[in-house]
């Protein structure tokens, strides 16, 4: 009997593979436990269709992330912070403040956990990197000025 594996099965194969197994093993274990489906023409067509839709969605998502990366590369955020008598910042600029400023100034919402920087503790222009997903990283500038 031929089965289409839905989940990875140790010593048999990975999800998406078509395997030839004995009838009892296929019916009583793999199909009964939800590890596989009988590899009928209908099941295989549906699997291929779902696979194509998933690939198309992935391409669409990557295209959107590339567009966002392009938008972010053109941005320079302006953040004003109080400074001491010697010109140093009080506390610095945190990831939370950067994410909030990005949302306020550019209307782009980024999770602060995806920002790849430490607390910025000096005035001037700093480059910040952000993980967008699917191995796509974007960089943008932050200008920290005295209040």
Curated annotation (Swiss-Prot):
SUPFAM superfamilies: L9 N-domain-like, Ribosomal protein L9 C-domain
GO biological process: translation
Keywords: Ribonucleoprotein, Ribosomal protein, RNA-binding, rRNA-binding
Source organism, top-level taxon: Bacteria
Any Gene Ontology CC annotation: ribonucleoprotein complex
PROSITE patterns for this protein: RIBOSOMAL_L9
GO molecular function: rRNA binding; structural constituent of ribosome
NCBIfam families: L9 (TIGR00158)
Function: Binds to the 23S rRNA.
Entry's family note: Belongs to the bacterial ribosomal protein bL9 family.
HAMAP family: Ribosomal_bL9
Full protein name: Large ribosomal subunit protein bL9
């Amino acid at each position: 009997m031929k089965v289409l594996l839905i989940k990875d099965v140790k010593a048999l194969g990975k999800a998406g593979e078509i395997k030839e197994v004995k009838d009892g093993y296929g019916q009583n274990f793999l199909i009964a436990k939800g590890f596989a489906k009988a590899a009928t023409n209908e099941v295989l067509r549906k699997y291929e269709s779902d696979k194509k839709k998933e690939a198309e969605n992935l391409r669409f998502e990557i295209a959107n992330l590339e567009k966002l990366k392009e938008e972010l590369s053109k941005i320079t955020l302006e953040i004003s912070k109080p400074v001491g008598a010697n010109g140093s910042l009080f506390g610095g600029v945190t990831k939370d403040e950067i994410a909030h400023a990005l949302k306020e100034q550019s209307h782009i919402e980024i999770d602060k956990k995806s920002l790849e920087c430490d607390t910025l503790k000096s005035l001037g222009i700093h480059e910040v990197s952000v993980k967008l997903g699917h191995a796509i990283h974007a960089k943008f500038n932050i200008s920290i000025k005295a209040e």
